[in-house]
Structure formats: C-alpha cells, structure tokens
Amino acid sequence: MVQVNFQVLAELDAAGRAALLRRSETDLSMFLEKVGPILEAVRTEGDAALVRFGRELDRAEGLTREGLKVTEAEFDEAFGLVEPEIVAAIRFAIGNIRTFHEEQAPEPMWLKELRPGAFAGDRFTPIRSVALYVPRGKGSFPSVTMMTSVPAVVAKVPQIAIFTPPAPDGRVDAATLVAARLAGVETVYKVGGAQAVAAAAYGTETVTPALKIVGPGSPWVVAAKRLLAGVIDPGLPAGPSESIILADETVHGGLAALDLLIEAEHGPDSSAWLVTHSRQVAEEALAALPGHWSAMTPQRVDFSQAVLCGRAGGIVLTGSAEESHAFVNDYAPEHLQILSEKPFEHLGRITEAAEVLMGPHTPITIANFCLGPNAVLPTSRGARTWGPLSVHDFLRRSSVGYVTAPAYPELAEVAKRLAEYEGFSSHANAVGPMRDAYLKR
C-alpha cells in the first residue's frame, strides 16, 4: 500500500526540520567524477566525441558527424509531424511569453543628471552568444525551448543555439524544432548531457562556442556546468523540479492534491510538498490522491509516488499560517502556488520563492506553459538570491558616466581628496594640476 510522507512540523526537532529542506537530487560528487573525462574528450576530440557519447549515453545509434546540426529540411519536416492544434498552442504560448519579456526588457540606456553637468546611468547590450539547453530524458519539452528562446530573441542576442539530446534514430523532437523556429531560433544541435555543455564551452568543428548556457538539466548537465564555470557562464542553478503548494482552510484538499502532483510527476528526483495549517485540508488531500493517480499514466504515477512517498515530498502540517509562511521562506521553492480565497494576504509574508502563483485559477501548469512569465527557475534554494530566467540574463549592463567642464572642478576636488587619503598618487594626479595643465591647452 502506498504510504504518503506526512509530517507534523511541531513534532520535528531541528534536524528533522532541516531534512525537509533537502532536495531529492543526487549528490553531485559521483557525477563530477564521471563528467570530467567527457568534458576533456569533447575539448580534445570535438565532433568525434559528440557522436560517440551520443551513441553510448543517449543510445542515438543514428547520430552522425554530418548530422549533428539540424538542417532546414528537418525544421520544415517537423511542422508536418506535429499536430496543428499543438502548433497553434505553441504559437499562443510564445505570444504571451514574448509580450511578457518585451515588457520586461529595459531601455537600451538611461542617464540621470546627478549634479548639474554630471551624468551617470546604465547601458544594456546583448551578450554576443548563448547556448540554450533543452532536456529530453523523461519527455519532450517544447515549453523549455519557448522559455529559453524567447527572452534571448527579445534581448537581440546575435548568436543563439539550442542543444538537445537526439533520439535513437539521431533526430530531434519535432515539437522542439517547431517551438525553436516560431520563437526565432534557427540553430539547433543534436547534443545533450555533459557533452552539450562541453561543446557549448569549447566549441567543435560543427559547434560554435558560446559565452553562456542556460536551461534545466540532469545531474550530468548540472555537474558539467559546475566544472566549466570558469570557461562558460553556467547561468542560474536549474536542476530537478520542485514545488510547494501552500493551502489554507478556504480551499478543498482535493484541489491541493491535484496541484501537488504537477511537479511531482516530472521524475523521481523532483521535490513536491503540500504545506497547510489545516488538518482537514491535509486529510482531504490524502484521501484524494488515489483518485488522482487513477487518471495518470503509469509512468507518471510511479514518478509522483516515488516523490510523495520519499524523503523529498509529501504533506507538511504546520501549526499556523505564520508557521507555513516561515517554512516556505526557509525552503525557497522553485514554484510556489498559494491556494486560498485570499491569496494576496499570504503574498506579503512570502519573501523567498522563485515563482508565486496565486489563487485556485492559477495552477503551475498554466505558468509552466503559457501564462507569460519565465518557467526556467532556480532550484535547490537558489531562490534565496536568484530569480527566474529573464531578458536581463541575456544582456550585459555597463555603467555610463559623462562629466561636463563646468561640473568637473567640484567632482575632481572630492575625488583628489579621497585618492590622497587612500594613498593613490596617480589617481590624485589625474584630477589635480597636471590634468588642469592639459585641459587648458
């Protein structure tokens, strides 16, 4: 019989509470050891290593050196392989995602006159090249393609390339190609796993190297990003899926259970908790889960049961709404859904969550696919300092300053005084009489 993990927070000591905060993702130490040789092989062997690892690790026997990059014909064929209603859904989602990220995009530059004649501001320019990682291990993810591609295109990154694992026949998921083209990305490589991160970092005969890589992935991908952080910007920490459903007494526990399964079904390495101070809601959720499982595919049932019956998922019963809020902030979840008739009353208490979805009509599903905000989010408590993937992740920010001749003397005098105090003679000379002599010429 299935035994869902049920924890009463008041009954746990400090160690027990700390254990609830741990994610289910595997210890990376084992992967760090195994990934090292893969990265070195790609660096030294290039395309040959990509094909070899594609065949060995992704079982893509049909992969060839000539076929590492998706062709125009493959893009065109993809539209014939995906049902029209799915293509329409992808178009709809991309429209919302683009609108959101266009609103998010900053002006190219702003300047403010801080003192008469002294101006300073910020200037934003796109990163020269980025790699977008789209996983495939437990399913097809055109949604990840949309969420990574659209902000990069809105940011006007000149060189954008998608990396995604090939199927056994050496082909790429058709819906991923449809999403890529509709989003505005034309370069897709049939490379996944640690070897994709290495190819993006070092480049090969076929792959053009990038300055940054973004997108969620397996522990192999996470380990590779960590090892290559000095070569390529690894972006925000995006590992296995995680969520908290925060429910109060104003909703039915069956609804909370329905939404609890959204992230739990991603895979056995996901983390998913229902947090509530209402015992009735908790008991209703427990009672509803078997019925919800009966409406899922066997594989997704297995995944979600592994999560909810393991150490990284289940139900947490707290003593009060305030205690629930504190638990959420300690956990710093990737996804937070607030199930309440008055969700905004809870929102003010939440400080550490990458995504906050409010009310019974805003399930994680809608946000994952088509609401508009980005669904590539920091995991493993990354929400304590990181936010969702955004246009800003694809932009460089440079500060800009301009001082006019009338404003110069006042600023120079202050700067000279501070430079002399800190012992920097050249700093002081650059704003002293020596400069004045040159400026008078």
UniProtKB/Swiss-Prot annotation:
Signal peptide residue numbers: none
Protein name listed in UniProt: Histidinol dehydrogenase homolog
CDD domains: Histidinol_dh (cd06572)
Species in which this protein is naturally found: Cereibacter sphaeroides (strain ATCC 17023 / DSM 158 / JCM 6121 / CCUG 31486 / LMG 2827 / NBRC 12203 / NCIMB 8253 / ATH 2.4.1.)
Active site: 334-335
EC number per UniProt: 1.1.-.-
UniProt superkingdom: Bacteria
Binding site for Zn(2+): 266, 427
Top EC class, one word: oxidoreductase
Gene3D superfamilies for the chain: 1.20.5.1300, Nitrogenase molybdenum iron protein domain
Gene Ontology CC annotation, any one: cytosol
Keyword Zinc attributed: yes
